[in-house]
């Protein structure tokens, strides 16, 4: 299933959870992702752990560290995606830092991603002006190349991003790093309208979305999807000594978020 098919199926706003591959270890990570799907996730965003995640706050940094300390490598991350594909066809997006792509080479990274079953790739620190290799590889292997749209993105730059993006726009709701926040800014709601008016791609909102009421506000403002990461990762961190409780709390949170979003599953 690609993103266009997913958005066409969803009634209301898509709910997309984000977790780090291999957090806290490979086997638990697979069960967490299975729980996300069972709870109704419309798509998945999977982060490849990185030692210097400059766009991420404390929760994701700690998740990256747990995954790396468990021995996760880029090869392991692709194997994790292959295991995910054994039990779900929902779109799987990668959120990575470009150094991981650069070290392997864009063509090889995207080839591996396509073979594993990846739908789209967002390199958090890759501006579209420098994305030639990634864009060529994405086109070659049939992967959507996704870029961040920030509150500071002006209309001219937004037009340029729209021309090279596919899949969806990843709209950053706030300036700064990832992490759960207490409210949705009014400027975010206005930004959704501006981005949707700039092109035909769906808009997914991430960074700081942590409560069902946030999801409902964003859905009402016209967001096509919401991406929730730190709030889920915090449940992983809180329950490292009790996997069953961890999975149950994650399931319950996703059900609440999914209900707030509205949807078909």
UniProtKB/Swiss-Prot annotation:
Enzyme Commission identifier(s): 4.2.1.20
Enzyme class, broadest EC rank: lyase
Keyword Amino-acid biosynthesis: yes
Job description of the protein: The alpha subunit is responsible for the aldol cleavage of indoleglycerol phosphate to indole and glyceraldehyde 3-phosphate.
Transmembrane feature ranges: none
Alphabetized Pfam families for the sequence: Trp_syntA
Entry keywords, A to Z: Amino-acid biosynthesis, Aromatic amino acid biosynthesis, Lyase, Tryptophan biosynthesis
NCBIfam families documented for this protein: trpA
PANTHER family given in the database record: TRYPTOPHAN SYNTHASE ALPHA CHAIN, CHLOROPLASTIC, TRYPTOPHAN SYNTHASE, ALPHA CHAIN
Molecular-function annotations in GO: tryptophan synthase activity
Reactions accelerated catalytically: (1S,2R)-1-C-(indol-3-yl)glycerol 3-phosphate + L-serine = D-glyceraldehyde 3-phosphate + L-tryptophan + H2O
Origin: domain of life: Archaea
Organism name: Methanothermobacter marburgensis (strain ATCC BAA-927 / DSM 2133 / JCM 14651 / NBRC 100331 / OCM 82 / Marburg)
Subunit structure and binding partners: Tetramer of two alpha and two beta chains.
Pathway: Amino-acid biosynthesis; L-tryptophan biosynthesis; L-tryptophan from chorismate: step 5/5
GO cellular component term, pick one: cytosol
Protein name from the UniProt record: Tryptophan synthase alpha chain
Active site: 45 (proton acceptor), 56 (proton acceptor)
Keyword Amino-acid biosynthesis applies: yes
């Amino acid at each position: 299933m690609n993103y266009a098919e997913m958005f066409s199926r969803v009634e209301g706003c898509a709910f997309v959870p984000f977790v780090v591959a291999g957090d806290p270890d490979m086997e638990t990570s697979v069960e967490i992702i299975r729980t996300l799907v069972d709870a109704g996730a419309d798509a998945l965003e999977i982060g490849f752990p990185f030692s210097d995640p400059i766009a991420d706050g404390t929760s994701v940094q700690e998740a990256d560290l747990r995954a790396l300390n468990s021995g996760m490598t880029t090869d392991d991350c692709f194997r994790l995606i292959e295991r995910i594909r054994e039990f779900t066809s929902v779109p799987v997006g990668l959120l990575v830092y470009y150094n991981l792509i650069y070290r392997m080479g864009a063509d090889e990274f995207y080839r591996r991603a396509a073979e594993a079953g990846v739908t789209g790739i967002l390199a958090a620190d890759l501006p579209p002006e420098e994305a030639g290799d990634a864009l060529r590889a994405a086109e070659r292997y049939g992967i959507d190349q996704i870029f961040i749209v920030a509150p500071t993105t002006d209309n001219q730059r937004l037009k340029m991003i729209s021309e090279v993006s596919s899949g969806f726009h990843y709209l950053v709701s706030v300036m700064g790093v990832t992490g759960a926040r207490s409210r949705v800014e009014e400027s975010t709601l206005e930004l959704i309208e501006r981005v949707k008016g700039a092109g035909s791609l769906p808009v997914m909102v991430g960074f700081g979305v942590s409560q069902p009421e946030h999801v409902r506000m964003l859905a009402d403002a016209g967001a096509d999807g919401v991406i929730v990461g730190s709030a889920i990762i915090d449940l992983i961190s809180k329950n490292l000594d009790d996997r069953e409780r961890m999975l149950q709390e994650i399931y319950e949170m996703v059900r609440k978020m999914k209900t707030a979003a509205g949807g078909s599953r």
